[in-house]
Amino acid sequence: MPLKVYNSVTQSLRQVVQVDKSELWKGRPLKKLAKGISKTGGRNNLGRITIWHRGKGHKQLYRMIDFKRRVFDIYATVERIEYDPNRTAFIALIRYDDGKFSYILSPRNLNVGDKIISSDKAEINVGNCLSLEVIPVGTIIHNIEIKPGKGGQIARSAGTYAVLLNKDSGYAQIKLRSGEVRRISLASRATVGSVSNIDHKNISYGKAGRVRWLGRRPVVRGVAMNPVDHPHGGGEGKTSGGRHPVTPWGKKTKGKKTRKNKFTSRFIVKRRN
């Protein structure tokens, strides 16, 4: 979808660039596939802030997305394309031929009225879901399962995709947008195409308040705090902290490696860096 640039009627609109959503559904989500969510503001059950920079934001309804696509061999028709406040990509409401409704991530170039299916016998068309075993090498895919049957976890945000590089010994190698190459079981499923809303990376919020609507609070520098609040705090006048960069809890930061090895790390063929 094209970008929408506003005239500078006010200072807050001067820098705003948004994605044009005029072609999306303008009504409310399907009631049986939506539920309310409560905001915590980053607090735990004791009322203490455990996640910094989280605010309330605008009230939202959570759309229950089908990441598994486990309704096999039944065609579905795309009823409408909707905006989802909980994610960067758009979502599609689909109606199966047996009358059931479901929300899925909307791939790029998926239109209202298109027919899609989750089947290993399906054609390689945008929106169809197949196992990696039957998807041809070189195909662009998204919503990829790490563990078969768990549901898609890779390439779900706006404009993202992965490329199927090759298959060998029960595993497929996929290349992610970050440059990382991973081995995934051939029994895992993925959806053909790239995720919608590719222009999301080009938006500009234009003012701090628009970011607050998303539930994000301001980020304060440690050197601007008092010593009781941060190791970099205090000092006479403006100071540079006087020590190597650390977190509020005294651990080294800015270059300190924090990633811990997981069981799935063994499936990384090539690191993103």
From Swiss-Prot:
Keyword Ribonucleoprotein: yes
Region of interest: Disordered: 224-260
GO molecular function, a single term: structural constituent of ribosome
Keywords: Ribonucleoprotein, Ribosomal protein, RNA-binding, rRNA-binding
A GO BP annotation: translation
Signal sequence range: none
Pfam families membership: Ribosomal_L2, Ribosomal_L2_C
Biased composition (Basic residues): 251-260
InterPro entries in alphabetical order: NA-bd_OB-fold (IPR012340), Rib_uL2_dom2 (IPR014722), Ribosomal_uL2 (IPR002171), Ribosomal_uL2_bac/org-type (IPR005880), Ribosomal_uL2_C (IPR022669), Ribosomal_uL2_CS (IPR022671), Ribosomal_uL2_dom3 (IPR014726), Ribosomal_uL2_RNA-bd_dom (IPR022666)
Record GO cellular component, one term: large ribosomal subunit
Domain of life of the organism encoding this protein: Bacteria
Quaternary structure and interacting proteins, as annotated: Part of the 50S ribosomal subunit. Forms a bridge to the 30S subunit in the 70S ribosome.
Homology family: Belongs to the universal ribosomal protein uL2 family.
Role: One of the primary rRNA binding proteins. Required for association of the 30S and 50S subunits to form the 70S ribosome, for tRNA binding and peptide bond formation. It has been suggested to have peptidyltransferase activity; this is somewhat controversial. Makes several contacts with the 16S rRNA in the 70S ribosome.
Name assigned to this protein: Large ribosomal subunit protein uL2
Organism: Orientia tsutsugamushi (strain Boryong)
Name of encoding gene: rplB
